[in-house]
Amino acid sequence: SRRQRQMCIRDRNILYKQKKKLSCLILSTVLITACMLPLTGCGTELTLTTPISITDYKLNTYVQISSYTNVNKSIILEAISLCDHYEHIFSRTLAASELYKVNNKETSIISDELYELIETGLEYSRLSDGAFDITIGSVSRLWDFTSDSPSVPDASLISNALEYVDYTKVTLNTDSAGTHYIDMPDGFCIDLGAVAKGYIADKIKTFLVDNGVKSAIINLGGNVLCIGEKKKNTDFTIAVKKPFSDTGEYMERLNINDSSVVSSGTYERYFYSGDGTFYHHILNPKTGYPYESELCDVTIISHESTTGDCLSTTCFVLGADKGMELIESLDGIEAIFMKNDGTKLYSSYASSYVQK
């Protein structure tokens, strides 16, 4: 019956949320446990076998920093606290944040950090010809993928919101005194959710390195950034979870050092509507609805996490062919794509990172 079908869909969404909460709890362990095996001399000559590790809930996800350099624990705590600092700059929903004030026309003067990240977001919006668009905020706020009862927004609301999506109408300027300004039409809403975690990870890495950390792993809910090597001439091993796997199965194990691994896909946040239709969180700025894609996961290997964060989403929205074409045009970037049928695509040198 219709009621039974609705109850089935409700139960499936509840089960997904339970699994999502559990996966958030174990995500850092899954990825970082792989980096701790075997338990021998992880790091440089003066590093620890068992890392100084702190886990906290920040940025709506579980954050873990594990330092194999023997530093005071207060350094790790201060590094994690940077998540709060940057959330108060980049959050679209936090009323006290700088971006919230920009979106609500409370200010046109912006900080160096917000200027830098918006500029980066606009660069990738241009690179994708608008397939990725940081002004998607007017649409993304209609879709609440974190709700206990998510639903599809009314079509008229989506249609209206699309009138306020166009990255080309955002202008950044800096005056002779070095003060940054932003200008965009009323009703526009910038959403930096697809790029902020990578930027924050890079800033945390800089802080840790400046404080003497030579070997560490930063994990911001799956955005993984390594500092240095596991030990001299030995890479870290990063396990990339297979999309939609309930058993913790890995898509790949990657050997990397002093680099970033970032994945984006349809499995991160999604729900099923009353008729059983699958909706994921990567929205098309042209239609206002989730992208219909042959891809379910894009994993980027890069030196900087900001680059990986931006490219993982950009390549997903471009699709397999154009996304891989973009990767091949960039120096120092590798990618692994997974299609919905389980087929994996590798950029030219991506396989060199795969653990044999």
Regions found by a protein language model. Name each.
Residues 1-11:
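Single conserved hydrophobic/aromatic residue that forms the stacking wall/gate
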Residues 13-356:
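Mature catalytic core of soluble alpha/beta enzymes
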